[in-house]
Amino acid sequence: MSDKTQPKLWQVAGTLAIAVMAVGGMFVMTRATSRPMVSLGPVVGYATVRDHDAVLVAYGRSGGTIGPPFGSNDTWQERVAAIALDDGELLWDIQLHDTEGWERGVLAVADGLAYVATDEGLSVLQVDDGSIVVGDLGDGYVESFNGYNVDPRIDAVVALTDSGQVDAVPLGTTDIAAVPEDIAEAWRTTLIAESSPTGDSDFGTNQVDPAAMPTGMALPGGQLITVPKPYQSPDQQLLRDGKPLARLDGLLRPELVYEVVRTPAALATPGQLEEGTAMFNHHHSAAGPLGAEHGVVLVDGEPADDPGAEELRLFDVETGDTLAVIGGIDGYVRATATPKGPILVIAAAEGTGLDNDRVIIVRTDGRTTMTHIGDTDFWGRTRANVTTL
């Protein structure tokens, strides 16, 4: 055969280069179009991890990993992460399941174990590194976040079986124990066997009985912090016992941010049951002070120069000074006090749609960090991005 019919070396190299470029282009395209979508569960736990005070959060994620033909197509994930409360840094982040449900949360932490409920069931992790001790309780237990809860009377997680029986997992153990019948009966009408998008853990004040909604934020000394309605005052301002404390210029429809406490029907008082429980998750909601014990309050509103967004401002209740301004968010699903004072806010960044993937830690001196959870790098590896505000 003549050499003229043989492919030249440069032709072979050119063909290979084109193939590599095509495959590389496909890979880059899959990474560019695979931004992870993340939903953090608002039910969180607290633990000491590597000598850090930390918050444990459970979240669902879709996308962000390397899909076929280059990867495992591990698109849907339930994950749990530990975040340091002092600086917002990620301490660990592990995959719990390879499917994503509607709801998830860290129910309790005890004796180095974290109890995490998802729509796959109940799992138990080691808090120091996130290693999985128990993946799930077994096939006989419901696959529903709302099929699990904590009963402090018996110091245990209560778990609903497919047959309607209520079992207990004593905190600090992975054992299965019996539940006294009177306690089990109350939980049978509280726990929910089926997962549902309507069964979310809603920490909004819209779940609070309007008649029981506080008129202001009570301080330990008895004074009351309020934000007057527009029809009560033409000026946007923060009041302390009716006297101006701070102006709220540039903030539309400002409101105080309360700690919303959810009580499952099985543990609710007669008065709480009379106020009512949510139809889809069987919890009573009440609003109480947030930050006031440590001399601060949060105010939420819409910045006048950024319509449609939300902004949080932290105020000193003694001086009226603005200690922190948290902007660029599209709302928050929960604001809650951590055990030692800082306020934890789970929020969505502006323009991210339904993603609740920001863990904001607001310290009482105003120092604030925002941790972007569930993000992935170019190679699909999980990472967290921390911003100091």
Predicted features along the sequence, with ranges:
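Secretory-pathway ectodomains
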Residues: S2-L389
